[in-house]
Amino acid sequence: MLTKKQLDLLEFIHKRVQRDGVPPSFDEMKEALDLRSKSGIHRLITALEERGFIRRLAHRARAIEIVKLPETLGGAARGGFTPRVIEGDKPDAPLPAGAQAVSSADAVALPLVGRIAAGLPIEAINQNSASVAVPGQMLSGKGDHYALEVKGDSMIDAGINDGDVVVIRETSVADNGDIVVALIEDHEATLKRYMRKGSSIALEAANPAYETRVFTEDKVKVQGKLVGLIRTY
């Protein structure tokens, strides 16, 4: 039987994965549960893992997959933290739980418009030279969609690795905690977690090696919101 804190954390992780496709950061978990330190989150995660509700994925910093949910949260897990679509050239290799295969029947071709920095600045997005197939159900919400190749490791704790392809829905607005494509001062594009703090906008990395960058709101334009991720094995 889970304690209230364990249940609250499991529900928070599940809702964030369902909404964003990626788990919350440890800081976000700490804030959501009103805990004073990350050590409390570590203890709760360990307890959930020991009870078989979650598992931490190897070689992915702090990446969490929900294995099951208690009946109070809807029973069986409806998808944990795994890439929403997997492509690869090893047909006999097992796919992670919850991964979706792309078939020609339901695939949609999106423009791969360039590279996005999950680390140091690289370039703004403006190179439409290729396309990538994604499942149609990934394209939710209003607005056009496009794909970007990730360069850098600043978002690894959110499960976004160097070389991944992210699927972005075009939008100019974002809620706190969204992972967005942000254009800084009209020339630098970056993939970061969006946090508005008064009249300032903080672009937070998901890697402790990178500092949070804070700008006045006139310096940052939201170009899109993360809705999916493609990883090649």
From Swiss-Prot:
Catalysed reactions, as listed in the record: Hydrolysis of Ala-|-Gly bond in repressor LexA
tRNA processing in keyword set: no
SUPFAM superfamilies reported for this sequence: LexA/Signal peptidase, Winged helix' DNA-binding domain
Site, as annotated: Cleavage: 118-119
Keyword check for Lipid metabolism: no
Pfam assignment, any one: Peptidase_S24
Organism superkingdom: Bacteria
Active site residues according to the UniProt entry: 154, 192
Key words, A-Z: Autocatalytic cleavage, DNA damage, DNA repair, DNA replication, DNA-binding, Hydrolase, Repressor, SOS response, Transcription, Transcription regulation
Biological processes per GO annotation: DNA repair; DNA replication; negative regulation of DNA-templated transcription; proteolysis; SOS response
Cited InterPro entries: LexA, LexA-like, LexA/Signal_pep-like_sf, LexA_DNA-bd_dom, LexA_repressor, Peptidase_S24_LexA, Peptidase_S24_S26A/B/C, WH-like_DNA-bd_sf
Enzyme Commission (EC) number: 3.4.21.88
Residue ranges of DNA binding: 26-46
MF terms in GO: DNA binding; serine-type endopeptidase activity
Subunit structure: Homodimer.
Listed NCBIfam families: lexA (TIGR00498)
HAMAP family: LexA
Family: Belongs to the peptidase S24 family.
Free-text function comment from the UniProt entry: Represses a number of genes involved in the response to DNA damage (SOS response), including recA and lexA. In the presence of single-stranded DNA, RecA interacts with LexA causing an autocatalytic cleavage which disrupts the DNA-binding part of LexA, leading to derepression of the SOS regulon and eventually DNA repair.
Name of the featured protein: LexA repressor
Species classification: Bacteria, Pseudomonadati, Pseudomonadota, Alphaproteobacteria, Rhodobacterales
